Regions:
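Juxtamembrane/disordered regions of integral membrane proteins
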Residues: 1-150
């Protein structure tokens, strides 16, 4: 695993997803204000963990880098397809994790209480995140014919 490349992929992918989340309302999807949401959730835990919106955005960036590291260590060479397709598949995994862990933790409930527009916006964002992580980090998986001894 190339940690520097994974961290860079995480930063670029998180910035890409954040940019998309900011414009989603212009295409009819609900606003997903991740920085404010994480900030509110941290403040609800205790006054010690209270952070402003900038702290929420920083936490989102850190989580984005951590997930990119997980992708690099465990998923990049195990998923099928091109680096972009592997990233898209990983984006679906991250979306499911977000809906099972982060959405309930931030008060949105499991799978955003079935709000289809919110789910669509979240899935779109995570597909962008995963696609960018896969494209920026990923190398091509060697074909079986190129393997030594083939």
């Amino acid at each position: 695993m190339d940690a520097k490349r994974a961290a860079a992929a995480g930063v670029i992918a998180t910035a890409s997803m954040t940019a998309l989340l900011m414009v989603e309302p212009s295409i009819g999807l609900p606003k997903i204000a991740i920085g404010e949401t994480l900030s509110s959730s941290m403040s609800a835990i205790s006054s010690v963990t209270a952070v402003g919106p900038a702290g929420g955005w920083l936490l989102d960036l850190i989580v984005g880098v951590v997930f990119a590291m997980i992708y690099a260590a465990y998923f990049d060479q195990r998923l099928p397809g091109s680096r972009f397709v592997r990233g898209l598949l990983f984006g679906v995994v991250v979306f499911i994790v977000a809906q099972l862990i982060f959405a309930p933790a931030t008060g949105s409930g499991f799978f955003s209480h079935g709000d289809l527009e919110l789910l669509a916006g979240g899935l779109l964002g995570h597909l962008v995140y995963g696609g960018v992580v896969g494209y920026v980090y990923g190398g091509e998986v060697p074909s079986p014919a190129a393997a030594p001894g083939a």
